[in-house]
């Protein structure tokens, strides 16, 4: 695989993931041609991809931290050391032996302390290059054809207000647009997925496609109201959860009622509470809870529950050794389970957990 091909693959993955997660959109389908069902064009796809064109692509593992994030106390100590060093250096120029020797030694000591302080400062990664790469529309998605139109970062043209300004747009502009009141999808997509967690199905049945291939919401006015409530609450998820679970709809019995069996056999209109399957992690958690083994400790490292010996022997790129967690920590909630992408823990695989090769909003359970 050529480096340029990797760049195209990474860009396409970012477009697919970002558009699906936040917009419930299949913008990734417009990589090689205009979208067949929704009004996304190839130009929309590559303009969206251009938001990520200033990310440094190492291609050889995680880069080292390159941005210091000192605490207030560390900043204060560093400033004090710098001031003392500069003061001593000015005195060295006028001093004579043996005082000069003592001053030089003191400067060396303070400099060593300063270096130690710098090593104690936490670092984060600023994966932004100085010069964004040129982004072109690739005919049929062919990375070898560099004759296409050069595009700048931008959002899909049909989605209302443009972000055009007298400068190159950044990912911060994209983020602000995604959570703005003007955005037609983000809040609706979010509350629809939250609704599914408590009612078994979304107000719109397809969680990862809000286009023509998705499902029309059964209660569009309710979906709009919840979306506005989410925005006006300051995107307060706890508020939305509370709102849903104290509703009369949520507190209904899941037992079928004679009067609704014929009018709403599939519970499409939420005439009763749903009975729905739970995810693989929750099946494990429930089994551990029933046996009295579940550890409810919050936080900490990921865990590696028992799995058959040699299970990883078929895993390539690179070979890995699985070391089962010891003690009660292996019984922590499924939230903390180690995930080996494309090679799931057997228990997760048995109950249809996703492989995480691609972003999934709705599991096939």
Range-by-range predicted roles:
Residues 333, 340-352:
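Active-site Gly/Thr loop motif
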Residues 8-11, 39, 76-329, 348, ...:
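Primarily short, surface-exposed interaction patches in extracytoplasmic proteins
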Residues 55-58, 342, 354:
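Hydrophobic alpha-helical segments
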């Amino acid at each position: 695989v050529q480096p340029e091909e990797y760049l195209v693959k990474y860009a396409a993955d970012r477009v697919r993931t970002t558009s699906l997660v936040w917009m419930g959109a299949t913008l990734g389908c417009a990589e090689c041609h205009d979208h067949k069902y929704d009004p996304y064009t190839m130009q929309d796809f590559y303009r969206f991809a251009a938001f990520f064109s200033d990310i440094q692509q190492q291609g050889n593992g995680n880069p080292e931290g390159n941005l210091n994030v000192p605490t207030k106390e560390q900043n204060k100590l560093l400033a004090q050391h710098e001031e003392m060093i500069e003061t001593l250096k000015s005195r060295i120029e006028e001093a004579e032996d043996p005082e000069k020797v003592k001053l030089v030694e003191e400067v060396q000591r303070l400099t060593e302390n300063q270096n130690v302080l710098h090593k104690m400062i936490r670092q984060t990664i600023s994966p932004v290059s100085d010069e964004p790469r040129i982004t072109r529309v690739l005919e049929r998605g062919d990375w070898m054809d560099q004759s296409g139109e050069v595009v700048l970062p931008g959002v899909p043209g049909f989605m209302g207000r443009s972000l055009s300004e007298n400068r190159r747009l950044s990912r911060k502009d994209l983020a602000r647009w995604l959570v703005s009141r003007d955005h037609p999808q983000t809040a609706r997509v979010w509350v629809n997925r939250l609704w599914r967690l408590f009612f078994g199905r979304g107000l719109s049945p397809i969680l990862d496609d809000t286009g023509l291939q998705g499902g029309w919401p059964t209660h569009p006015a309710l979906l709009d109201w919840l979306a506005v409530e989410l925005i006006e609450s300051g995107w307060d998820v706890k508020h939305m959860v509370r709102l849903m679970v104290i509703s009369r709809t949520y507190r209904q019995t899941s037992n079928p009622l004679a009067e609704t069996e014929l009018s709403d056999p599939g519970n499409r209109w939420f005439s009763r509470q749903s009975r729905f399957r739970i995810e693989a992690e929750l099946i494990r958690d429930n089994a551990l809870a029933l046996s009295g083994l579940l550890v409810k400790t919050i936080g900490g490292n990921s865990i590696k529950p028992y799995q058959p010996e040699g299970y990883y022997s078929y895993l390539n790129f690179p070979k890995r050794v699985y070391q089962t967690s010891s003690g009660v920590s292996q019984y922590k909630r499924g939230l903390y389970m180690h995930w080996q992408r494309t090679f799931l823990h057997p228990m997760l695989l048995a109950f249809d957990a996703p492989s995480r090769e691609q972003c999934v909003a709705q599991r096939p359970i």
